[in-house]
Amino acid sequence: MKLSQIFIGVSLGLVALSSSAELQDKNNNKKDIEVIKIKGSYFNNYQVDNASGAMRANVSLLETAQAVTVIPETIIDEQLATTLGEVLNNDASLSPGSKQRNREVFSSRGFELSSSTGYLRDGHQHWSHYQQPIETLSRVEVIKGPSSILYGQSAPGGLINMVTKQPTSTSLLEVSADTDQNGSTRFMLDAGGEIMADTNYRAVLVKQDVNFDREYQNGEKRERDRFLGSLIVEHQVSDNFIVNAYYDRTNDKAGLDTGAWLNADGDVISNEHTINDFSWAFTDITVENKGLKLTYFVNPEWQVKVGYNEQDFERQRFESSPKMPSNYQQGDSYSSNPYDRHDDWKFKTAFIDINGEVSFGGVEHNILIGANSLDYYYGQLRTSADSISYTPGQTEPMRPNVSYKTDTSLSTTEYDYYGIYFQDLMSFNERWQVAIGGRYDKQNKENADNESLLPKVGVLYHPAENSTIYVNYSEGFEPQAREHIDDVRDRNDGMKIDATTSKQIEIGAKWQVSNRLLLNAAIFDIEKSGTLISERLLDDPLFDTVTTQAGLQKHKGVELSAQGAITDKWFVITSVMYLDANYEEDAKYQGNTPVDAPEWSASLWSRYELTEQLALNAGIFYQGERFADNDNTVSKDSYSRVDVGATYQTRIMGKKVDLRLNVENLFDADYLAGGGINNVTIGDGATARFEVKTSF
């Protein structure tokens, strides 16, 4: 769709909505009755005062010695977000990476988040090798900096905690449908309420079909077909005991797009709308989560929570697997190495938290004692076909007749770990608080056992009731793939390898203005050490290499953010980050900057209420220049993307109806998002989306 068509459509839509709202106001004014206005009654949920994942306890953000961003459901709905990446755009500390193979990769403060250790769902470690079903979420918490003390192995940049919608005691039924200019559709049902006395439920159903802008070599469009079903039931056994059980299933099948290729100048080779994979390449994912959460209130001050979750993740991936040749130019031939592969991941997680408040020695203590565990299994079957040489413009090759089912050599990986943690938030008076904590962690894995002991300390000073100045020191760790160096031609063969560790010092300030706008500032210095460095030996007759744990990576930066209401009608969530990220000690990348770690990034999303029925949105998302390879030879230009939207609330046949129109990338800017030289994501052009939602 051309920009002019979108602009005209948006303009006409807004004029119509404004006229309708004005007419309704005039009609209302004719009624000679007293009207009491409640400002912000419909659009007032931008600010969140706490994050359950940051401290694993009911602690306000002003009492949390750590930078945390909470993106609420209101913003997720306003932006018509369908992927986690669209939600995380609202925090400048997160930069997008590759989207190849129908999943998303992100970096936090310049450190890539692992699919296995970078994501939580309701505090459970969550295997995130797919596009998360965000329709089940009530909010997304971005916990910044090393967080291993409470959750175990994790990246230095932080964690993403996805908090799910919970059962409601009051009746809830929302039905919505949205579509875009490419013909994509999404239908959603969100229901909740009371089943019987003391038993409530929440159910979500989603059916989505996506038509992408990019197409295959044979002219076929890439498509995606997704189904989501979720059910949570909660029963209050007694005044002190609550049982919560849940199940959800995601089926997600999509054609493969492993990303575009870049030349040495950072430009896309060939047509930016053409996919290098063949049209018969696909990924088919089925994910099931089932679990139980028990909450027991010992007394008004103390509670015990026990949680268990099983995640079964199965994926078939039939790849054409195109390979980018060296010095590739448009029209050159390239090879593809097809294969059919089946992956089976099983995540079994559990935790127990004992949390409460006690006072002794004139000090108030908010204490957390807990333990969590993970039982991990992975199995793979794979069968490969013969390599294919292809020149763009030729007829697309037929799909090879291979199947993973013919592979009889199942490749498996298994391990388990557990951790015990302690945390104490001590309040000495109205001005001073100190948070201390520690964790012992043990991993059991063949040839890769690992133990870690981690501290954490934070000091908070409150100049006033609504402000905080804090300093925080925390550590994190990520286990190595093996316990010892295993290479007879290496000088240090047999040397014990410790886990990769990270340390952070963060100084920050928080100020809650008029109980409706939260301002944050943070300065951080993160150091990741212990990565393996192998150096080649030229004149040693006995050994080829020497490997040490001398790797060092340093990321320093500043973050500023604001979230909440500026006036009764104007709401914002905005952030900016400056980042200086470098490999300080590395045999290959010494002094270089990691991929997709821009020096500057920023985000802004805002809403202005014209009337109680009509609100307008506008946002801008900026990513600075980024490197596309760790050698720092290819860079991607900076970009700014402008999004706009409008929501109109009315009643049809007595039912509340919300009409929403959004335009992403209003000015049709050309840009490259995340990914490297052979898997970069091309930003979508101007895209209009429309939603109708009704409540019963």
Locate each region found by the language model:
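Conserved C-terminal beta-signal and adjacent last beta-strands/turns
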Residues: 343, 367, 471, 595-696
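Gram-negative outer-membrane beta-barrel transporters
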Residues: 431, 525-527, 548-631, 667-670, ...
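Membrane-embedded beta-barrel scaffold of Gram-negative outer-membrane proteins
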Residues: 293-309, 313-321, 462, 469, ...
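Surface-exposed extracellular loop regions of Gram-negative outer-membrane beta-barrel proteins
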Residues: 251-267, 375-379, 459-506, 511, ...
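Structural signature of Gram-negative outer-membrane beta-barrels, strongest in the C-terminal barrel
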Residues: 236-240, 345, 364-366, 372-374, ...
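Acidic, small-polar-rich N-terminal luminal/periplasmic segments of exported/outer-membrane proteins
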Residues: 13, 31-170, 507
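Outer-membrane beta-barrel translocator/receptor signature
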Residues: 135-138, 149-229, 237-241, 288
